[in-house]
């Protein structure tokens, strides 16, 4: 896929994901938790679109290495955030 087509597809996908998030927020009767979960899902999908379409993550001779670096960074971030939340929730329950 050439660059112009790739950028156009990425741009349209980003706009669609943004509009879907706005629609879910303004025009549905879901609970706050459901809306938040759906919007975070759209955000992660949009981040992947940005990395693949605009940042050319998988292109070039180091594309696979770059992909593994991003996956590793995501795993480390998730472990840190989830672990911190887990420890903070556990510690808070013992003080009450």
UniProtKB/Swiss-Prot annotation:
Keyword Lipid biosynthesis: no
Membrane topology: Multi-pass membrane protein
GO cellular component: cytochrome o ubiquinol oxidase complex; plasma membrane
Catalytic activity of the protein: 2 a quinol + O2 = 2 a quinone + 2 H2O
GO BP, sorted A to Z: aerobic electron transport chain; ATP synthesis coupled electron transport; electron transport coupled proton transport
Protein name: Probable quinol oxidase subunit 4
Keyword Transmembrane assigned: yes
E.C. code: 1.10.3.-
Chief subcellular location: membrane
UniProt organism field: Staphylococcus haemolyticus (strain JCSC1435)
Family as reported in the entry's similarity comment: Belongs to the cytochrome c oxidase bacterial subunit 4 family.
Annotated compartments: Cell membrane
């Amino acid at each position: 896929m050439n660059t112009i087509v790739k950028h156009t597809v990425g741009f349209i996908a980003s706009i669609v994901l943004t509009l879907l998030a706005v629609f879910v927020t303004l025009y549905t009767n879901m609970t706050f938790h459901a809306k938040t979960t759906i919007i975070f899902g759209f955000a992660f999908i949009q981040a992947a679109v940005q990395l693949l379409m605009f940042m050319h993550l998988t292109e070039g001779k180091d594309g696979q290495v770059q992909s593994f670096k991003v996956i590793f960074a995501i795993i480390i971030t998730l472990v840190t955030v989830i672990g911190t939340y887990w420890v903070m929730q556990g510690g808070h329950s013992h003080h009450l």
